[in-house]
């Protein structure tokens, strides 16, 4: 089976693929202070809870936007699974032209999402990935990655408000009961939540206008299901887009 690993700034998402099927997946917190041994022990516990052994994995692929942890994940694959993983980066076969000024600058997760989105839909796309940063990526109808936009993530925005405004409390990310809120917590949630919905729709609409296209807009990432129902532009949420993209890239490079 194939182990797919997506290392983000806030979370590490792992999956086990058996053929074309994603059979198990886990989400753990990103911690740059953890060693490969510590992550290995954690993975052993996750595998055991799923009734799996490390010997069921015979291949692995890694996407990482956290350079200090890329080597840690490679070490886990070598030391615990006894294999050399593929790492998404320069030189890997994507099957997708990257129309970026410097293709090496594009985050691995953005390329993985673009590859998966186009492979699944075979049409022009805007992919919105809600992570520590929220990324907007445009793929044209020819399957070319054209670039996009990066915005501060929802959690970062909320944390900045708490840190910089002395009298405002730290609040959870949530859809408030109404936009005209009657207490401070709901007022903050209303401003952040609906402000962010507006940010998403405005950026998508500008991408659509600039591209002179009618792309399908899909969302992924931890907060996609929270934002998408209020968005006027997002038509689909794909929770496993990145893991599916890693599986596709593995098949193209094996």
From Swiss-Prot:
Cofactor field: NH4(+); K(+)
InterPro entries: ATPase_NBD, Type_III_PanK
Keywords: ATP-binding, Coenzyme A biosynthesis, Cytoplasm, Kinase, Metal-binding, Nucleotide-binding, Potassium, Transferase
Molecular-function annotations in GO: ATP binding; metal ion binding; pantothenate kinase activity
Binding site for K(+): 129
Binding site for substrate: 100, 107-110, 184
Gene3D superfamilies named in the record: 3.30.420.40
GO annotation (BP), single: coenzyme A biosynthetic process
Location within or outside the cell: Cytoplasm
Cellular component GO terms, alphabetical: cytoplasm
CDD domains: ASKHA_NBD_PanK-III (cd24015)
The protein's annotated pathway: Cofactor biosynthesis; coenzyme A biosynthesis; CoA from (R)-pantothenate: step 1/5
E.C. number(s) listed in UniProt: 2.7.1.33
Enzyme class: transferase
Disulfide-bond pairs as recorded: none
Record: active site: 109
Cofactor remark from the record: A monovalent cation. Ammonium or potassium.
Record text on subunit structure and interactions: Homodimer.
Stated name of the protein: Type III pantothenate kinase
Annotated source species: Pelobacter propionicus (strain DSM 2379 / NBRC 103807 / OttBd1)
């Amino acid at each position: 089976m194939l182990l797919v690993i997506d290392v983000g700034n806030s979370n590490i998402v792992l999956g086990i693929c058996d053929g074309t099927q994603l059979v198990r997946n886990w989400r753990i917190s990103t911690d740059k202070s953890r060693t490969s041994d510590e992550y290995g022990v954690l993975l052993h516990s996750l595998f055991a809870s799923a009734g799996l052994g490390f010997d069921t994995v015979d291949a692995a692929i890694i996407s990482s936007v956290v350079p200090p942890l890329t080597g840690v994940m490679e070490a886990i694959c070598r030391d615990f699974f006894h294999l050399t993983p593929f790492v998404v980066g320069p030189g890997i076969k994507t099957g997708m032209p990257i129309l970026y000024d410097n293709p090496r600058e594009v985050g691995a997760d953005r390329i993985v999402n673009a590859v998966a989105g186009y492979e699944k839909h075979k049409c022009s796309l805007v992919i919105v990935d809600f992570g520590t940063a929220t990324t907007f990526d445009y793929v044209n109808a020819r399957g070319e990655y054209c670039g996009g936009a990066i915005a501060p993530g929802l959690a970062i925005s909320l944390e900045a408000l708490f840190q910089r405004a002395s009298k405002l409390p730290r609040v959870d990310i949530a859809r408030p009961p109404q936009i005209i809120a009657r207490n401070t917590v709901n007022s903050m949630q209303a401003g952040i939540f609906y402000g962010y919905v507006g940010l998403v729709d405005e950026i998508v609409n500008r991408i659509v206008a600039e591209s002179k296209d009618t792309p399908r807009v899909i969302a992924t990432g931890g907060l996609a299901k929270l934002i998408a129902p209020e968005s006027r532009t997002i038509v689909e949420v794909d929770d496993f887009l990145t893991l599916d993209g890693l599986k596709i890239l593995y098949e193209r490079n094996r």
